[in-house]
């Protein structure tokens, strides 16, 4: 999304679902999206906010100080980056979606199947030990409520329009 292989002002609508958060510089990404949009064009995307997987983050924090869960930009930072692009009107909305799992491993397997890997610079180098993993599983289990384990997804919906 930071270097789209498209001609300038060639697209009426851009739609992206859960890809934008992997771009390192949101202002470059928004400038690139604005470049390819025709006047009157619209971009709609979803991204993840900082409360995403907060339960998993807390469970790992009980084990060590390494960053095991990806961090995501707050909605205000995304909005500020988009508003720095001339000729763009932006509207962002946020929705916190609680998910429920019967086992922590179900959540971990789902994340692995999605291809969600830890992209943080201060993540733990090398493989995670069995002991650390067991510690995280125990810490996460402490959050079990009514037979299920919560997992929060903090979803940001962005709509921006090119004048």
Where are these regions (language model features)?
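A short acidic, Gly/Pro-enriched loop at the edge of an enzyme's catalytic core
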Residues: 2-14
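Short, glycine/charged-enriched secondary-structure capping and boundary segments
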Residues: 11, 28-30, 58-61, 105-106
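A short SAM/SAH-binding and catalytic strip from SAM-dependent methyltransferases
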Residues: 12-27, 47
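A short glycine-rich, Lys/Arg-flanked "PGG" loop and its adjoining helix->strand segment in the class I
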Residues: 27-42
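Conserved catalytic/acceptor-binding region of the Class I
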Residues: 38-104, 117-125
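Conserved Class I S-adenosyl-L-methionine
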Residues: 89-163
